[in-house]
């Protein structure tokens, strides 16, 4: 082995979780449902292919359609930790990969000097020992089997996308002071985008692609009743059909599944049996986040 190289045989997430090795897409869909996540067949197939082919999965769709929740649910199905990297404008490699614990390094130098140690080269060498390394999400994902969620990658800049390309190409990184670190088992990697900007084709080419739509009325009813077992079928149906009508309006921010669940929970807490104008007025803040949108929806429900 080359000095400084830490490498293991790359296994897929399916192989790394032995008892799941024979799962097919339908069994994944059923397993997701058991966690409370109602997935479409195409999403379950995309997950199965991502694991089978050792490829990242790029999930795109409007905010609130369940992209992040799908990663969480899949981590539960695989019984693996979820490691999440939340992207934002200005994020760089040190915040995503690793950094050095500068305060502890300074303490080490002072302790060495107090102990009468004068070998400058040895002190400098010890400063970059692994114990002073702060593992950020991407490095942690190389160190243990996991589901890696790179959330809202569209918020990051072009330079960070280029950095991700290198990481996702072979699930390995080189730390100059330590050497190369490669994954024992490449993580099931899920990237999400809310389409606030176009993500470069080069990054998408590394991945399998899946677009998540707002759910159909039937699927939204199932989602609501799965997540809120105490709700009646009639109220769940009225919520789902009303939300579908609302999404057709010209809104600043159309409600996603997360918001429809919040609205359903709010109506349930209010003891609603149906959506009366009065209850709608009291509860629309759970569904919509802009006053102009609320005014439009109030007019719709009053008509």
Where are these regions (language model features)?
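Extreme N-terminal basic, low-complexity initiation segments
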Residues: 1-9
């Amino acid at each position: 082995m080359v000095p400084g190289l830490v490498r293991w045989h790359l296994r897929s997430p399916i192989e790394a979780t032995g008892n799941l090795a024979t799962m097919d897409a339908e069994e994944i869909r059923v397993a997701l449902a058991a966690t409370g996540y109602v997935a479409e067949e195409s999403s379950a197939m995309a997950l199965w292919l991502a694991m089978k082919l050792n490829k990242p999965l790029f999930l795109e769709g409007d905010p609130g359609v369940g992209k992040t929740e799908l990663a969480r649910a899949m981590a539960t199905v695989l019984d693996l930790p979820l490691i999440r990297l939340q992207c934002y404008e200005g994020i760089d490699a040190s915040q995503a990969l690793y950094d050095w614990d500068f305060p502890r390094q300074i303490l080490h130098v002072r302790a060495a000097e107090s102990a009468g140690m004068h070998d400058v080269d040895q002190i400098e060498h010890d400063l970059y020992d692994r114990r002073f390394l702060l593992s950020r999400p991407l490095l942690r994902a190389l160190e243990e089997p996991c589901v890696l969620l790179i959330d809202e990658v569209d918020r990051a800049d072009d330079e960070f996308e280029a950095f991700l390309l290198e990481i996702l190409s072979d699930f390995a990184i080189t730390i100059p002071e330590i050497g190369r670190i490669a994954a024992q088992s490449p993580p099931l990697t899920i990237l999400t985008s809310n389409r606030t900007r176009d993500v470069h084709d080069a990054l998408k080419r590394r991945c399998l692609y899946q677009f998540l739509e707002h759910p159909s009325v039937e699927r939204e009813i199932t989602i609501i009743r799965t997540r809120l077992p105490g709700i009646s079928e009639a109220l769940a149906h009225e919520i789902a059909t009303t939300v579908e009508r609302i999404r057709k309006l010209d809104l600043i921010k159309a409600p996603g599944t997360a918001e429809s669940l919040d609205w359903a929970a709010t109506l349930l807490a209010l003891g609603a049996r149906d959506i009366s104008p009065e209850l709608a007025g009291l509860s629309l803040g759970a569904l919509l986040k802009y006053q102009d949108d609320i005014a439009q929806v109030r007019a719709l429900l009053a008509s």
